[in-house]
């Protein structure tokens, strides 16, 4: 089961001796910084945990699965997230 935001806030509050309000403020601040970094194209790296970068996806041709009609899919941006060494090690043990 994945943690949702309230689960994450509770865990951070427990582990760091913060109140839930303080932990929620920290999570919200991280979320804001993360989104700003992705929007600006700067990327974000937490050494050992993960790195994230904004990537451009090229325009391409696809097919409508219902009709089989060929459609043009415009270029867009996405996010590429790569696991860091600490995270990789933790999940393989």
From Swiss-Prot:
The keyword Metal-binding does not apply. Histone-like DNA-binding protein which is capable of wrapping DNA to stabilize it, and thus to prevent its denaturation under extreme environmental conditions. One of its GO terms (molecular function) is structural constituent of chromatin. The lineage of its organism: Bacteria, Bacillati, Actinomycetota, Actinomycetes, Bifidobacteriales. GO terms for biological process: chromosome condensation. Homodimer. InterPro entries: Hist_DNA-bd (IPR000119), IHF-like_DNA-bd_dom_sf (IPR010992). Belongs to the bacterial histone-like protein family. This is DNA-binding protein HB1. It holds the Pfam family Bac_DNA_binding. CDD domains: SPO1_TF1_like (cd14435). It comes from the Bacteria.
